[in-house]
C-alpha cells in the first residue's frame, strides 16, 4: 500500500470518527492544536462545556448548543508528513455535491465514455538466453560489464547494458485527478507546428511505466496539466488518484501484466481526439505479444508508412500519429524493462539499432529534434562489439554498418574508427555497382538509409563521406525514380526500405513536375507525383552542412553537387557559390546550366556573380588504360532540350568497364545526349566517346602458368617419395 493510500485510509477513519448522528445539529467546527508532544491518548465524542486543546493532538470542537461542546481528537503527526500535506491540499472540504458530480464526469470515465478492453495473451520476450556455460570472458573494457564468448556468439547479462540514464523528476504536479509523485525518469519532447498552432507529445519513461502526454495548450510545457490528454502504460500500482476517481474507472486497456490509464477531459477528447474512445485504439500494438520486440517494431513501421504516405507528419496528431508514438514508447520500454537474463550481444545490439531507426523517423516527422532517453552502457557495448568484429571478413557488413549508424546517431563518433566508415564505403561500392544495372532491393535501400545518415550526421572522416555522397548522387538517376515509384506501394516495407538514394544524395534538382514526367511512364505506379515528392522530401530534410564546400547553399536552391575527393562540382541554372564557372553552351535557348568548380576543403562562399569563367573544351575521345586515369571521376549526362539527366560516379576500373559497355544501357544514346567528364583533379571536358584499353593477361599465358605449377608440384611429390 502506497503512502498516499495509507493516508487516505487514515483520513477516512478520522472522518468516520467525527461523523454526526442524524439527530445531531451543530455549527461549523472549531479546530485547534497544541505544540508537538508524545501524547497519543485521544478523546472520541466527548461532551463538555468547554473546548479542549491537548498537546500533540488536533482537537475538533463542535459547538452544539449553548455551553455544550462535543470534541474529537486525532494525533497531529499523521497530518504533518509531506504526503499528507499534499493530499490535504488536493481536497476541497467546502465543495458542493453538484460541483463534485460535475467534476467527476468532466473527465473520461471509461465505463461511461469509452470502450474498455482486456487482452488475454501470452506475454513473453523474443530474446533467447544462450544455454552454454559462461567461462570465457573476452572483454572487460566497460565497468561492471562482462562480455563472454560462446559458440553462439558474444553474450552479456541483459540488465548490465540496457539500464537507461534516469534523473529525478516530479510527475503530475497540482493535477486535478492524479497525486503528484517524485520518481526517476527520462523525458522526450516531440513538437509539431501546423499553421499558428503548436502541438507537443511528451513521453516520460520511468522504471515501471511511461506517460504519453498530448499537450493541447497553446504553450509547450514539460509537466502535465489539466488540459492535456494523458495516457499511462505499465505497472501503475505506485500511482494514486484523487477522490472521486479510482484507477478502475480510468483503465482503458488491461493485460495480466500492465494497465493503460487515460486521464483527459471529456470535452477535449470529444472535440479533438474521439478515436481514443474506440475499440480499435492501440489494438494493433497491445492485442499481440507486446514484449516481442519484432511484433511491436512491425506495428510501428506499419503506422510509419501510413504517416509517411498520407502526409500526416505535417498535420495535427491523429489516431495513427498517437498510436505510432505509443508503439515507439512500448519499444523503448521493452528494451529496458526486462529481467536480468543472459542474451546474445548481437541480438541486443540489433534491438537498439531498430529503436534508433524508429527515432530517426520521429526526428524527421516532428519539427524539433528531442533529447532522447540515453542508454550509456549499451552505447559502450556497441563500441566493444564493433571492435571485436571490425576486421573480421566473416561478419556481415550490414551488422558493422548498423552499429556504426547507431553510435553516430547517439553522438558517439569518438567510439568509431576510420575503419568503420571504410567498411561502410565497401558496402556502398557493392550496392552502387549493382544499382547501376538493376533495381535496388529492399535490403539495399535499408543499408543506403543508414549510409545516408552516417554521411550527413558527422564531420569525421570527410574524404570517405565525400565519396559515399558521390555514389548516392550517382544512384539517383531517372531510372531509379522510375523503379522507386511503384516500390513504395509494396506491402510489408519498413520505413528505411522505402528509402531512395535521391533523398540522401547531392541531387537537389528533382521538382514535383520532373518526377511526374518520369513516373507517368511506369504503368505500375499507384502514387501520385505529389505523394512521391512528399515522401522524397520527407527523407531529404537535412542541408549539406557537414560538407564545408557546400554548407552555404540553400537546401531548396535546386542544384546538383558532385563531391569528389579533392574537388566539388555544383551544377545549377545560375551561379550559387564562389569558384570557377563553366557555362554549358549546347542547350536549348530557354535552358541555362553552369558548372561551378571549387576545392573540396575550400569554405563555401555564397555568391550570385561569376568570379572566374572558362569554357568547357571538347575532346573527341578519351582512352582509359591500366592506370585508370579517370577513376574517382564522374560523367555528367545531359540532354540539349531537357537539361541534366544523369551523374555516374566511376569508383574504379570495374565501374568504367560497366558504364561504358553499351549493352548495360547506363548512359543514354541519342543525337541530343552529351557527356561531360568531371575529373578528380578539377578538369572539365566534353567527350564524345570513351575507348577502354585495359590490357589483360592472355589465356595462353594463364594456361602456361597453370601447367608449370602442376609440373612443379608433381616434381616435389616425386622428390619426397625418393627421400
UniProtKB/Swiss-Prot annotation:
Gene3D superfamilies: Herpesvirus glycoprotein H, C-terminal domain. It is found in: Virion membrane; Host cell membrane; Host endosome membrane. The chain crosses the membrane at residues 701-721. N-glycosylated, O-glycosylated, and sialylated. GO terms for cellular component: host cell endosome membrane; host cell plasma membrane; membrane; viral envelope; virion membrane. Glycans are attached at residues 39, 45, 144, 174, 270, 340, 411, 543, 621, 681. Residues 1-23 form the signal peptide. Pfam families: Herpes_glycoH_C, Herpes_glycop_H. Belongs to the herpesviridae glycoprotein H family. Interacts with glycoprotein L (gL); this interaction is necessary for the correct processing and cell surface expression of gH. The heterodimer gH/gL seems to interact with gB trimers during fusion. This is Envelope glycoprotein H. It comes from Guinea pig cytomegalovirus (strain 22122) (GPCMV). The lineage of its organism: Viruses, Duplodnaviria, Heunggongvirae, Peploviricota, Herviviricetes. The gene is gH.
Amino acid at each position: 500500500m502506497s503512502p498516499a493510500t495509507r493516508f487516505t485510509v487514515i483520513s477516512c477513519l478520522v472522518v468516520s470518527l467525527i461523523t454526526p448522528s442524524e439527530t445531531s445539529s451543530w455549527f461549523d467546527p472549531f479546530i485547534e492544536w497544541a505544540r508537538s508532544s508524545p501524547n497519543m491518548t485521544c478523546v472520541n465524542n466527548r461532551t463538555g462545556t468547554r473546548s479542549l486543546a491537548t498537546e500533540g493532538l488536533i482537537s475538533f470542537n463542535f459547538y452544539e448548543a449553548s455551553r455544550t461542546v462535543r470534541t474529537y481528537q486525532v494525533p497531529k503527526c499523521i497530518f504533518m508528513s509531506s504526503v499528507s500535506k499534499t493530499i490535504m491540499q488536493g481536497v476541497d472540504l467546502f465543495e458542493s455535491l453538484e460541483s463534485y458530480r460535475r467534476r467527476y464526469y468532466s473527465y473520461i470515465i471509461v465505463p461511461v465514455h469509452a470502450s474498455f478492453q482486456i487482452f488475454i495473451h501470452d506475454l513473453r520476450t523474443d530474446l533467447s538466453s544462450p544455454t552454454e556455460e559462461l567461462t570465457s570472458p573476452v572483454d572487460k573494457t566497460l565497468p561492471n560489464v562482462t562480455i563472454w564468448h560462446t559458440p553462439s556468439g558474444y553474450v552479456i547479462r541483459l540488465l548490465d547494458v540496457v539500464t537507461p540514464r534516469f534523473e529525478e523528476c516530479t510527475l503530475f504536479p497540482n493535477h486535478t485527478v492524479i497525486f503528484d509523485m517524485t520518481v526517476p525518469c527520462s523525458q522526450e519532447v516531440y513538437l509539431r507546428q501546423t499553421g499558428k498552432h503548436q502541438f507537443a507529445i511528451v513521453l516520460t519513461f520511468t522504471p515501471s511505466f511511461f506517460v504519453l502526454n498530448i499537450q493541447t495548450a497553446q504553450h509547450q510545457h514539460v509537466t502535465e496539466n489539466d488540459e492535456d490528454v494523458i495516457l499511462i502504460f505499465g505497472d501503475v500500482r505506485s500511482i494514486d488518484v484523487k477522490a472521486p476517481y479510482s484507477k478502475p474507472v480510468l483503465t482503458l486497456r488491461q493485460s495480466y501484466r500492465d494497465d493503460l490509464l487515460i486521464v483527459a477531459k471529456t470535452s477535449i477528447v470529444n472535440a479533438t481526439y474521439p478515436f481514443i474512445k474506440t475499440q480499435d485504439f492501440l489494438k494493433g500494438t497491445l492485442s499481440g505479444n507486446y514484449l516481442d520486440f519484432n511484433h511491436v517494431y512491425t506495428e510501428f513501421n506499419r503506422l510509419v508508412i501510413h504517416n509517411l504516405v498520407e502526409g500526416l507528419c505535417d498535420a495535427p496528431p491523429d489516431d495513427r500519429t498517437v498510436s505510432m508514438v505509443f508503439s515507439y514508447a512500448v519499444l523503448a520500454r521493452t528494451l529496458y524493462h526486462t529481467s536480468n537474463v543472459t542474451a546474445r550481444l548481437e541480438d541486443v545490439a540489433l534491438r537498439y539499432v531498430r529503436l534508433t531507426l524508429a527515432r530517426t523517423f520521429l526526428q524527421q516527422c516532428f519539427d524539433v529534434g528531442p533529447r532522447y532517453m540515453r542508454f550509456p552502457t549499451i552505447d559502450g557495448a556497441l563500441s566493444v562489439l564493433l571492435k571485436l568484429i571490425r576486421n573480421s571478413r566473416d561478419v556481415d557488413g550490414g551488422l558493422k554498418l548498423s552499429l556504426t549508424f547507431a553510435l553516430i546517431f547517439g553522438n558517439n563518433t569518438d567510439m568509431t574508427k576510420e575503419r568503420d566508415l571504410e567498411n561502410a564505403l565497401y558496402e556502398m561500392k557493392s550496392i552502387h555497382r549493382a544499382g547501376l544495372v538493376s533495381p535496388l532491393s529492399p535490403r539495399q535501400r535499408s543499408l543506403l538509409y543508414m549510409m545516408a545518415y552516417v554521411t550527413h550526421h558527422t564531420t569525421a572522416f570527410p574524404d570517405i563521406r565525400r565519396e559515399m555522397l558521390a555514389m548516392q548522387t550517382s544512384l539517383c538517376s531517372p531510372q531509379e525514380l522510375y523503379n522507386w515509384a511503384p516500390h513504395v506501394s509494396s506491402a510489408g516495407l519498413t520505413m528505411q526500405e522505402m528509402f531512395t538514394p535521391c533523398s540522401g544524395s547531392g541531387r537537389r534538382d528533382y521538382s514535383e513536375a520532373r518526377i511526374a514526367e518520369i513516373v507517368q511512364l511506369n504503368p505500375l505506379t499507384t502514387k501520385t507525383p505529389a505523394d512521391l515528392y512528399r515522401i522524397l522530401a520527407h527523407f531529404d530534410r537535412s542541408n549539406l552542412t557537414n560538407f564545408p564546400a557546400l554548407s552555404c547553399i540553400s537546401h531548396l536552391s535546386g542544384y546538383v553537387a558532385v563531391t569528389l575527393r579533392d574537388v566539388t562540382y555544383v551544377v545549377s541554372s545560375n551561379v550559387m557559390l564562389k569558384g570557377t564557372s563553366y557555362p554549358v553552351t549546347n542547350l536549348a535557348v530557354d535552358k541555362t546550366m553552369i558548372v561551378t568548380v571549387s576545392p573540396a576543403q575550400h569554405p563555401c562562399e555564397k555568391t550570385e556573380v561569376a568570379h572566374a569563367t572558362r569554357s568547357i573544351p571538347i575532346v573527341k575521345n578519351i582512352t582509359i588504360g591500366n592506370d585508370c586515369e579517370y577513376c574517382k571521376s564522374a560523367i555528367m549526362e545531359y540532354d540539349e532540350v531537357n537539361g541534366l539527366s544523369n551523374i555516374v560516379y566511376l569508383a574504379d576500373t570495374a565501374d568504367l568497364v560497366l558504364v561504358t559497355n553499351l549493352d548495360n544501357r547506363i548512359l543514354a544514346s541519342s543525337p541530343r545526349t552529351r557527356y561531360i567528364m568531371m575529373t578528380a583533379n578539377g578538369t572539365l571536358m566534353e567527350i564524345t566517346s570513351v575507348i577502354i584499353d585495359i590490357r589483360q593477361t592472355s589465356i595462353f599465358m594463364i594456361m602456361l602458368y597453370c601447367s608449370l605449377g602442376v609440373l612443379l608440384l608433381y616434381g616435389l611429390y616425386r622428390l619426397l617419395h625418393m627421400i
